[in-house]
Curated annotation (Swiss-Prot):
This is NAD-dependent protein deacetylase sirtuin-1. Inhibited by nicotinamide. Activated by resveratrol (3,5,4'-trihydroxy-trans-stilbene), butein (3,4,2',4'-tetrahydroxychalcone), piceatannol (3,5,3',4'-tetrahydroxy-trans-stilbene), Isoliquiritigenin (4,2',4'-trihydroxychalcone), fisetin (3,7,3',4'-tetrahydroxyflavone) and quercetin (3,5,7,3',4'-pentahydroxyflavone). MAPK8/JNK1 and RPS19BP1/AROS act as positive regulators of deacetylation activity. Negatively regulated by CCAR2. A motif (Nuclear localization signal) lies at residues 32-39, 223-230. GO terms for biological process: angiogenesis; behavioral response to starvation; cellular response to glucose starvation; cellular response to hydrogen peroxide; cellular response to hypoxia; cellular response to ionizing radiation; cellular response to leukemia inhibitory factor; cellular response to starvation.
Amino acid sequence: MADEAALALQPGGSPSAAGADREAASSPAGEPLRKRPRRDGPGLERSPGEPGGAAPEREVPAAARGCPGAAAAALWREAEAEAAAAGGEQEAQATAAAGEGDNGPGLQGPSREPPLADNLYDEDDDDEGEEEEEAAAAAIGYRDNLLFGDEIITNGFHSCESDEEDRASHASSSDWTPRPRIGPYTFVQQHLMIGTDPRTILKDLLPETIPPPELDDMTLWQIVINILSEPPKRKKRKDINTIEDAVKLLQECKKIIVLTGAGVSVSCGIPDFRSRDGIYARLAVDFPDLPDPQAMFDIEYFRKDPRPFFKFAKEIYPGQFQPSLCHKFIALSDKEGKLLRNYTQNIDTLEQVAGIQRIIQCHGSFATASCLICKYKVDCEAVRGDIFNQVVPRCPRCPADEPLAIMKPEIVFFGENLPEQFHRAMKYDKDEVDLLIVIGSSLKVRPVALIPSSIPHEVPQILINREPLPHLHFDVELLGDCDVIINELCHRLGGEYAKLCCNPVKLSEITEKPPRTQKELAYLSELPPTPLHVSEDSSSPERTSPPDSSVIVTLLDQAAKSNDDLDVSESKGCMEEKPQEVQTSRNVESIAEQMENPDLKNVGSSTGEKNERTSVAGTVRKCWPNRVAKEQISRRLDGNQYLFLPPNRYIFHGAEVYSDSEDDVLSSSSCGSNSDSGTCQSPSLEEPMEDESEIEEFYNGLEDEPDVPERAGGAGFGTDGDDQEAINEAISVKQEVTDMNYPSNKS
């Protein structure tokens, strides 16, 4: 492009002449030059009187042969004659079009890349989009080189030069996610100029939410920006529901995107983060000054004290673990040419060990390390000795007295951008994919969490995970231990996949929930009745009254003690407490303490007193089954079973889907974890489909405008439901580290 610009700026030249010079020079003498088709409007691809269709080949005038300058001049005069013959109106159209993207015959200039969607989340502008993608794909060698033109080292990782380009990248998820008609930054800018109160906008976006008064206006506007940046939610396809449908898709699809998280590495023995003896707990003991466990992944904290990170690095450094069945399954799909791309959030490099070639490491990996100062880059083996000896690795090229000359593994820390390669890949893969499979990820952190909503909504989506993801709508949900599910799929796929199976037994399907285990029945028989006396007219608050509060506290304590063995999940010898259960218990105990408080009985009139006590009692009743008797449905299955819950949910061993004792309604392990009150409402098996986003109403009637890429920042405030997840994910990247890119047994 630099050469083209130089030629175009030569005195007496023109962009078209420059292109013609090059084309004529590269063609053997005597061969005709082809006229490039023009896309600038009707009638410009042929001369008057010529039939429609492809442009005919042209002969260079004999006098011009062998003289590139003369050939260019001849073609230029011929083009001018055509434009004049086409009429004044067409000439004006040609002039306007040439100014935008066509520099005349012989050279088509670089096309300007418009926003991804000019209309509100409109993905139908195929004509212009296809031409742009073809040009961009040709420029980066798309599909010809899986690393998009980057150099490949023998171990399959980037060269230093390509990584430096990635660090300087300004690419973002706005390059591949559906864009609104008017961007969120423009929308906010307009309202800032007219003095709109951001709380008014937030009230429309989140009617049931009241932002804390201490939040300043700029923080609230940042919240608005992030909410408006959310792409519309995908709706489930009604024609894809069963595991048989999933197997058929795996057999037929040729461009599969597999998005993997920590769940695929659990069985590999990689230490978890959040258990009692996990990495976080041990770091808290060794580094009491660490403000919070996630700080070890904060780039600013790393510059101040890199020791916590390198202690963690030793725990999961490459070379200590072997790939899981999930990794091998993806590698075989890659080998058979079915894998379009594996986007992994993990940093353990097990994808490379398994032999996966089409891999995008969204959050980096331990494969290489580079100096914070000079960017000198080395292989992971160069710093292995220092890391295992718990010595902070230093850059060999920087001065010894430079405190920041640290060799940092190329993991994406909080405060750092994702590699440009991720955004480049997603920009084109989103239009190529014919099947999306999410394995072992809760998709809580952006921009990876935006992938399911950003690909065409008709593309089938399959979830393989321990727990359901209520904020997304998958066509088939296979819930349980990822290796168990992949093992069953391999049995059904047969051939080379069947050879991967760790368990030779094919599972049998049941459609009715198995009865409770003897252990659970014995436990339930010892429980006292629900600690609320509800009359026949339970809808009347006047007739609902709690018993003595001390009874509730006593019963809760007994239940907590008896239920300890039911509130943990097993994962290959590692026990992890359910944080949402703990949170629920705290809420219940807090309510009980309020009931014990004698001041509560002395507040207000008798009517106000009764209503307040009724409200507390109602909260306790909602919390009671969640705290007292929730059990994993998967524990009722025998070793060779899985449960089918129509229309599209399957429960395998290890699934974190629970059953409440009172009404036996299924609920997710994450139920109630985002609720301020701690209450939990069990979702139905077939979750209602969401209507189109209400956010679209903000854009109706507004003109198309480009917008700057989105950036995460700001702070959030409490609310319930999907809106809370949208805010939490969009506002701060500092969230669930283990759900982001660091392996744990809770994915």
